Amino acid sequence: MAGALVPVVMMRRFTTLVGPGTYSTVAIEVKDHQNAILSAWRGPTSGTLAFYVEESIDQKTWSLCSGAVPDWDPGAAAEGTATASLRKRWLRVRAVLAGAGARATCWVLGFLERRES
């Protein structure tokens, strides 16, 4: 039986990123949760955009969550869903925008699944 689902917004609708670079969300504490079930959407981009669902024990060293898709890109004007297993205390989403004159509009939201006792 799955644990209770708690809504989470990692990047608000409609976040616009301008210029090549790495954009990270604020880390959220997820020690009471076992999975992150996230949906991402992006509009057409100038350049390339990839999302990374990452976790950390100390908010300094980050690693890709188990089960997360590396270089996750749902595609232009498309929504994609991914589930990541949570094993560490902190969760964030990192967006990497690349290319000359790069810009993108996107969002990432979903649910955190509570651990069962």
Model-found features: residue ranges?
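Short, intrinsically disordered N-terminal pre-domain segments
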Residues: 1-17, 112-117
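Solvent-exposed serine/threonine-rich low-complexity stretches and specific carbohydrate-binding patches
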Residues: 11-16, 64-74
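Surface-exposed ligand/attachment interfaces on beta-rich extracellular proteins
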Residues: 15-30, 44-50, 74-81, 99-103
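Noncatalytic modules at the cell exterior or secretory-pathway interfaces
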Residues: 34-38, 85-107
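Aromatic/hydrophobic beta-strand junction motif of beta-rich domains
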Residues: 40-42
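A structural motif
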Residues: 69, 110-113
